[in-house]
């Protein structure tokens, strides 16, 4: 009798523990809602304190990295510690996932905050432009060309800036 009671008690505890929390996707949706309502601190608390990174699947880890870096960007926080965005970009490239372009955008900003080399940043923008072009995403094409030409101009690379601007103009004509 005691043995059966112990089994029933153990099964009940396991059942209660498994039903207790929200799924990671529900937490992501809740964080999105909080961001849309401009409750950035609450969204940060949810992502940073309520999600255990080591328990996430690969796809959830990529999504977590992209969302957290984007949130830090919206909060005006330094992105120096958001190296998980590298994982997100690599995962989305490997799986040809939809969030790739937004992950590129956040990674480019992260690279600027971490003072990565100029050529690394230019190469990232080139890669992002190619990806946006292959997806026919004119919004991200404009964003990435704008960032690339601004970076080149800011570094005094005037010939490159002119060449990139002409390339941007040609692509614009092709999409019209």
Regions found by a protein language model. Give the residues of each.
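Positively charged n-region of N-terminal signal peptides that target proteins for export
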Residues: 1-6
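Bacterial N-terminal signal peptides
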Residues: 7-16
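A "functional boundary" signal
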Residues: 19-173
């Amino acid at each position: 009798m005691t043995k059966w009671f112990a089994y029933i008690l153990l099964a009940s505890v396991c059942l209660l523990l498994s039903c207790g929390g929200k799924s990671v996707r529900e937490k992501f949706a809740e964080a999105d809602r909080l961001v849309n309502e401009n409750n950035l601190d609450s969204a940060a608390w949810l992502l940073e304190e309520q999600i255990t990174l080591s328990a996430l699947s690969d796809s959830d880890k990529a999504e977590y990295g992209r969302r957290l870096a984007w949130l830090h960007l919206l909060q005006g926080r330094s992105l120096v510690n958001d190296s998980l965005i590298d994982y997100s970009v690599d995962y989305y490239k490997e799986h040809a996932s939809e969030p790739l372009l937004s992950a590129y955008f956040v990674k480019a900003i992260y690279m600027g905050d971490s003072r990565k080399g100029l050529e690394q940043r230019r190469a990232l923008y080139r890669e992002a432009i190619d990806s946006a072009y292959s997806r026919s995403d004119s919004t991200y094409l404009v964003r990435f060309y704008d960032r690339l030409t601004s970076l080149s101009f800011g570094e005094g690379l005037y010939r490159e800036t002119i060449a990139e601007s002409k390339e941007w103009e040609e692509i614009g004509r092709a999409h019209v």
